[in-house]
Amino acid sequence: MERILDGDLVVHFKGKYYEVLSTNAHYSEDHSLRLVVYKSRDTGDIWVRPYDMFMSKVDKIKYPEADQEYRFEVAMRV
């Protein structure tokens, strides 16, 4: 898996595109929970997801039609 960087344009395995705003956010005082903040290119909505979940592999049993190996993959590096 290619490392995700701030500013990257990523594609979700379901086909939507997102801009990564931050890969170094933390929840409150718990600095062990790293978060990714990202913005929908379609709606402008802001989303936050734990880094490990953001970088996880697609469940091919649940989504056998998915072409991507990972939940999010780099579409364009800015």
Question: Where is each model-derived feature located?
Answer:
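Mixed-charge, low-complexity intrinsically disordered regions
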Residues: M1-V78
